[in-house]
Amino acid sequence: MQLTRYQFEIMNYLQSNQNCFFDLRSISDKICVSSALVSQQLEILEKSGLVDLSDKIIKVTERGLLVLEQYRVRKAIILAAGFGSRMLPATKDKPKPLVLVNNVRIIDTLLDALIKAEINDIVIVTGYKGDRFNELLNKYPTIKLVNNPIFDKTNNISSIMTVLNQLDCCYICEADLYISNPNIITKYQYCSNILGSYSLQTDDWSFKMNNGFIDQYQKGNTYCYNYYGISFWTRDDSIKLKNDFKEVYNNGGTNYFWEFIPLVLKKDNYQVEIRQCQKEDIMEIDNYYELQQIDSSYK
């Protein structure tokens, strides 16, 4: 059984808040859908045996969880090969994702969020001082480490090429994002999307929305969405990504950021949504000065 978008959003919310008191307004507010529409869709879901409402408690049934499985995120690919030169001297002897921020490694905030969402198939593509990532195995014994031997000769598209065959219903994540709100990583996703927060003006990488989908990916923009390096790709889009990455990379496109392929060069092949988050959900630490402002031990 295929779910409509509204049905998915309702069930996704309910499964993350199992056995909650039935409050139509709360559901409506959380998923940004009118109460009337939520009520209508809940009636359909209940008649289909996907949700159960009894004694003012609402929950997703076992059958409902089976239906949600088709939207399950299967794995996460984390790109961690870069040097992080702007973070020197903190990155002199370790990669940026392993830098401690208030006694927590940056990458741990992402790994903990993934594991909390029951996404345990995690591949980390390493490069600069790649052997240092072995220390993660003590806390995260199931992660897989894959080395990109040409990380310093190409852009991060080469890291994607290193694990190309593993693209399938997966998150693609940058490793140097400090996750303040782990709930931005969810177990289920309906369609291909990229995290973004609304901004009146930015000098950083950003995009706009056109008919509901990402458009005008560029550096610097107004009335736009800041690009955050956490995206999800469906099975169908993963297949297209594999073909498009191969075509671009094998024809001299070794110096592209990987996201340029689906968002710019081959954008007509994709319809990628913006999954909105708040600026405070993710902390981007771009340089050593910003690190000092967040963690006084570096001053």
Where are these regions (language model features)?
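Conserved core of the sugar-phosphate nucleotidyltransferase
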Residues: 9, 181-252
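A short, conserved structural fragment
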Residues: 46-56
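Short, cationic-aromatic polyanion-contact patches
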Residues: 3-6, 56-71
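N-terminal glycine-rich phosphate-binding loop and ensuing alpha1 helix
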Residues: 14, 30-31, 69-126, 130
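Conserved alpha/beta core of the MobA/IspD/sugar-nucleotide pyrophosphorylase nucleotidyltransferase superfamily
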Residues: 65-76, 227-299
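Conserved beta-loop-beta/alpha segment of the NTase-like Rossmann-fold superfamily
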Residues: 134-205
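Short amphipathic alpha-helical interaction segments
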Residues: 32-44
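Short amphipathic alpha-helical interface segments
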Residues: 2-29
